[in-house]
């Protein structure tokens, strides 16, 4: 098990370096497009957005690469069957609650108000406010964690009812859930600390935190699985240890900015009630997205064994670009937009959104097409070893192609949704999310029960729903005048379109020259995959350069 890990790890540096060069070039080009736009752009530059985004994206890239190391090891050891399905469900449930309590509704309500306290009342008031909010969050999550541990079998039955037909799978999932559920408390407190650090422009430390979970899971998978019965239980404990590491790692940085305080309860505090008031609709909005994921798991639990795992591994691949760019942009834009709104700088607010949208389109469009075209090489190179069979690889490829449809929409939502949250308008995204949820279920029924798409139909429904969500958010921002596009969008999009067409043609041509992807060892497959990725990057950015895409062109107001 250690040898494939070493081979994969050896190639990690070149992949990260390549990704960093591509990202750096795109960031410089996009940000430079606003040079010379007057006082508003100088205000944007003062925020050090480029530096912050590059730092967060680079650290996130490392975390995602380690995540692939983790998933490759897990696929080799556990394959795609009863054990892996049980772990995916047991890990998904606390993650869903984490997104609701911490990274979702809570951060949407907490960050703008914390930024307001810091800007208008000073750091002492912000520190007291943080202590009160931390106390309330700790109490609520402790109760939720206790209920989750005690009610694990009922939670499994509610979220994966198809597992009830197999007693072994049901019991294993329940046991894993009891171990992983306390992760919700640890990671939510970690996310709270990260939100404070982001507000103080300490973006890199919270961005590095997910790496610790991956390190914990890799260590347990490689060295401790023989000591657990069944071996998959090692991964449950790895999640719990990872949660502890994620929280503890950030505390010294919190102390450094003078915000390390003991949680306190004060339900009479006006700021706490403002957060609770904002969290009401925010929880509903975030819950809509998580309910959609739960419903997808319910559908998948009735499909053939392995369906949950196939969707999981495909989703992990899609999460690489979504995490490196989407999470980084969302992390930086929310506090930046909140500050612009608090200072009533309408022009800077709109330009921040335009900057994010251009960057998303420039990087998400080629990534989405590359995921679809390179689905077979990606799955075979990263996962098709050991117990992960050729059939598992083929099923995962179908899910990845379906997921890739929604990558652009997912990334756009990461930019557009903060445009509402920063204005403390959570109701609009909630209404849109509820409509999107309803349409997702219509598509689930159509793609799974009417059309023979099985698990790929569930992935396709998620992707199309993300595009619908992004489209509606964009329409609302434009209709309310919160966002006014900068000049040059039409030519910008046309040139990107031509560049991605050339990239796809190059990739398809090279694929015809490659031997079968189920032959050769991991190192050989990764070398071939790296060659394809490099060819795609060169053809895409080379085409843009041939069409006049130059850094000096971004010194004008008209972009491209």
Residue positions per predicted region:
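Membrane-embedded alpha-helical bundles of multi-pass transporters/translocases
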Residues: 41-560
